[in-house]
Curated annotation (Swiss-Prot):
Keywords: Cytoplasm, Ribonucleoprotein, Ribosomal protein
Pfam family, one: Ribosomal_L1
Keyword hit for ATP-binding: no
Keyword Ribosomal protein tagged: yes
Biological source species: Candida albicans (strain SC5314 / ATCC MYA-2876) (Yeast)
Name recorded for this polypeptide: Large ribosomal subunit protein uL1
InterPro entries per record: eL8/uL1-like, Ribosomal_uL1, Ribosomal_uL1-like, Ribosomal_uL1/biogenesis, Ribosomal_uL1_3-a/b-sand, Ribosomal_uL1_CS
One Gene Ontology cellular component: cytosolic large ribosomal subunit
Location in or out of the cell: Cytoplasm
Gene transcribed to yield this protein: RPL10A
Subunit structure: Component of the large ribosomal subunit (LSU). Mature ribosomes consist of a small (40S) and a large (60S) subunit. The 40S subunit contains about 32 different proteins and 1 molecule of RNA (18S). The 60S subunit contains 45 different proteins and 3 molecules of RNA (25S, 5.8S and 5S). uL1 forms part of the L1 stalk.
Alphabetized Gene3D superfamilies for the sequence: 3.30.190.20, 3.40.50.790
One Gene Ontology term from the biological process aspect of the record: translation
Domain of life according to the entry: Eukaryota
Amino acid sequence: MSKITSSGVRENVHKLLEYSTETKKRNFLETVELQVGLKNYDPQRDKRFSGTLKLPQVPRPNMTICIFGDAFDVDRAKSLGVDAMSVDDLKKLNKNKKLIKKLAKKYNAFIASEVLIKQIPRLLGPTLSKAGKFPTPVSHNDDLYSKVTDVKSTIKFQLKKVLCLAVAVGNVDMEEDVLVNQIMMAANFLVSLLKKNWQNVGSLVIKSTMGPSFRIY
């Protein structure tokens, strides 16, 4: 049973959007984040959960993606205007930790041709996995544009050592209804990952990049 109602969330979304679109409009597209504070959870002892959820709409349209591809996928990526790297490009990084870290920082997510996915750890070491950015596989039969959209629409909840986490659930250009729906979906999905569900939730807050926080739970 959800402890948040769409009317309660809507009220806060309304205030958040009003602030970002009228009170203090920024000259870039602000992301809306769901910030979660957990309680009665011990990251050392309890299971560190992780889960992914595909939202109906892309939270961050300007999210950057790079494709590690064979010749076929590198060509497809170029025709879509998406950055791509071939196996040779990856070999040129020569397992240099600094360069691989730089690559992991430069992009929000990665996609790799199915045929290459097994080679990624050998070529790049554990850096991408540690950053929570291990590539999503794509096959030649998949529509690459849809795959890119899927990756952009998917949010990831991952508990590390601290009891707070934040995920992008939308942006301030979205319709109120859409944003409310995305927040509700994300919050309820997160709660389903927790050992004691709502008893582990200390607080839920929504916030745009530069705006104030609004508590929804």
